[in-house]
Amino acid sequence: MTTLAIDIGGTKLAAALIDKNLRISQRRELPTPASKTPDALREALKALVEPLRAEARQVAIASTGIIQEGMLLALNPHNLGGLLHFPLVQTLETIAGLPTLAVNDAQAAAWAEYHALPDDIRDMVFITVSTGVGGGVVCDGKLLTGKGGLAGHLGHTLADPHGPVCGCGRVGCVEAIASGRGMAAAARDDLAGCDAKTLFIRAGEGHQQARHLVSQSAQVIARMIADVKATTDCQCVVIGGSVGLAEGYLEQVRAFLMQEPAPYHVALSAARYRHDAGLLGAALLAQGDTL
C-alpha cells in the first residue's frame, strides 16, 4: 500500500510517496507559508498534495507541534500564529479524499529510527536538537504519544531554574539553552546575531565564545539524557537534528554523559534517516504499526 507522507515544519513542507518497503518516490517540497494563516496553509498543502494523491491509498502527516484529536496545538502558541487549533487531519482528508493519520514530527522520527535498530532493542529514545529540542520515546516496542500528544517533548524539561525564559512559558527549559535558537540568543559581542550554523563554523575556527556555546548545549543535552535514562531505563538514545548531527557534536554529548555516574550511561548513536525520519515514521504508523 502506497502512503502519501507529509512533513510539516516551521520553514518547509515536504511530501513523498512511500511504499510498503519504505521506498521513497516523487518527493516534493514547498516553503511553509510565512503568514501562518489557515487559508495560506490549506492552499499550500493542496498544491503540495494534488500531484501525488492519485497514487496513494492513505495520508500520513508528521507535523511540528502537538497533535490532539487531529488538531494542531503547541506548547508555545506563538510558534503557530493563526494555525493554533488548525484541523489538520480534517483538512487533509478533504484535500486528498483519503484516510489520514497525524502525529508529532519527533514522535514519528522516533518510530522510524526505532525500526532501524536491532530487534533486541525494545526501549529507545530519539532526541532531535535543531531550531528547538524535541523527542520521542519507544517503550517495550510501543511509541508513547500520551493522551494529549505531549509525550516526548523532552526539550521542555528543566535544565537551569535560573536560565532564560522558554517560549512555552517555563524558565530554564533544555530547549531555551541547548537548541540552535537558544544558542543564537545567548551569543554576544561579535557573535551577536549569528545563527547556530555560523556558531559551529566559528567554534571550529577556535572562537572561544562559540566553543563555549556549543559545549554548553552538548552538556545540557547530556544531562537531559541522564534524566531520560533514569526515567525510562532506555537501551539506547538516537540523536538527530541539524545541531545534533553537526560535526563533533555527538562526541561532545557522549563525553559529557560519561562524566555522569555509571547508572545514567546509555549507548548513543546518530540518526540513520536524518531528514526523512518524520516522513518514514508517519508512513510506518499509517501502514499498520500501532502506537
From Swiss-Prot:
It catalyses: an N-acyl-D-mannosamine + ATP = an N-acyl-D-mannosamine 6-phosphate + ADP + H(+). Its EC number is 2.7.1.60. Keywords: ATP-binding, Carbohydrate metabolism, Kinase, Metal-binding, Nucleotide-binding, Transferase, Zinc. It comes from the Bacteria. The keyword Zinc applies. Zn(2+) binds at residues 156, 166, 168, 173. ATP binds at residues 5-12, 132-139. It is an enzyme of class 2 (transferase). GO terms for biological process: N-acetylneuraminate catabolic process. Pathway: Amino-sugar metabolism; N-acetylneuraminate degradation; D-fructose 6-phosphate from N-acetylneuraminate: step 2/5. One of its GO terms (molecular function) is zinc ion binding. Homodimer. Belongs to the ROK (NagC/XylR) family. NanK subfamily. Catalyzes the phosphorylation of N-acetylmannosamine (ManNAc) to ManNAc-6-P. This is N-acetylmannosamine kinase. The gene is nanK.
